[in-house]
UniProtKB/Swiss-Prot annotation:
Keywords: Metal-binding, Pyrimidine biosynthesis, Zinc. Involved in allosteric regulation of aspartate carbamoyltransferase. SUPFAM superfamilies: Aspartate carbamoyltransferase, Regulatory-chain, C-terminal domain, Aspartate carbamoyltransferase, Regulatory-chain, N-terminal domain. Contains catalytic and regulatory chains. It comes from Photobacterium profundum (strain SS9). The keyword Zinc applies. One of its GO terms (biological process) is pyrimidine nucleotide biosynthetic process. Binds 1 zinc ion per subunit. The keyword Zinc applies. One of its GO terms (molecular function) is metal ion binding. This is Aspartate carbamoyltransferase regulatory chain. Its cofactor is Zn(2+). Zn(2+) binds at C109, C114, C138, C141.
Amino acid sequence: MTKETQLQVEAIKNGSVIDHIPANVGIKVLKLFKLHKTNQRVTIGLNLPSSAMGAKDLIKIENVYVSEEQANQLALYAPHATVNQIENYDVAKKLTLELPKKINAIFECPNSNCITHNEPVDSSFTVINKNDDIQLKCKYCEKVFSREIVTERN
């Protein structure tokens, strides 16, 4: 007899699990945290069935713990994702995602005339959240962009 509730993605002993990522966003999260360049084992589930979301992505990273700062950056891509820190196969800590007030050196400014493209300065955005409409305002050119425009380019 086979078990009907078998895990589709293997459990990890120690590390981080990022769950409830909207489908087709998991690859962007990998790049955000530069997980495609790590030596640790990363397990990715794409378009997994989800009763709440229809389909979701999932990322498990062994021996790497997502920080609260990283979890807050994740909120730009997946505001309802969950981040669990795993120790000895058990959830040791659940991180709450909150949108950061500022984001530095993560995204490029979409404005091709912005000085961040030609000067040796890190990009810097202020996060604006009005009625769940998330926008990013560039510190240098002061232009405001939708979250989708900024995150799609990176």
